[in-house]
Amino acid sequence: MQIGVEAQRAVENRRVFVLDEDEITRTVLQFMLADDNETHEFATIDAALEKGLDWQPDLVLLSAAFVIRDGAELLHNLRSAWPGVKLLVICEADDAAGVAAVMAIGADDTLTRPFKVEPVRRKIDRHLGRKVELKIPVVVS
């Protein structure tokens, strides 16, 4: 059992692929997600597709650079290879045009840099169909 992880989450471990040419980005996201998810990182689409033949991911975090280079065809190919997969594209927070473009060609959502642990985990949990705890401050007067 994983330390600090609820028993139910340990049982329902989901598979997440992180695809980015940048090693630091891959490592950071794997570190953030590894407690609650079976997380694999890849520098190339081909490496991820090969691994995905035997171990289909539930969710893919995909560098915007891959999407810009290969366009909607890439998203279509990933969905064909892995039916039901959720595709989230990693974008820069200040790139509103890039975010709009990847959403227009079929991404399920975006994950924006800079990354913060709790927002990243909440977004991933939401797309994996897990209950997301709302933290609403209550003021008693």
Question: Which residues does each PLM region occupy?
Answer:
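Alpha4 helix (beta4-alpha4-beta5 surface) of REC/receiver domains from two-component response regulators
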Residues: 73, 93-109
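Acidic, metal-coordinating helix/loop segments flanking the phosphotransfer/catalytic sites
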Residues: 43-59, 63
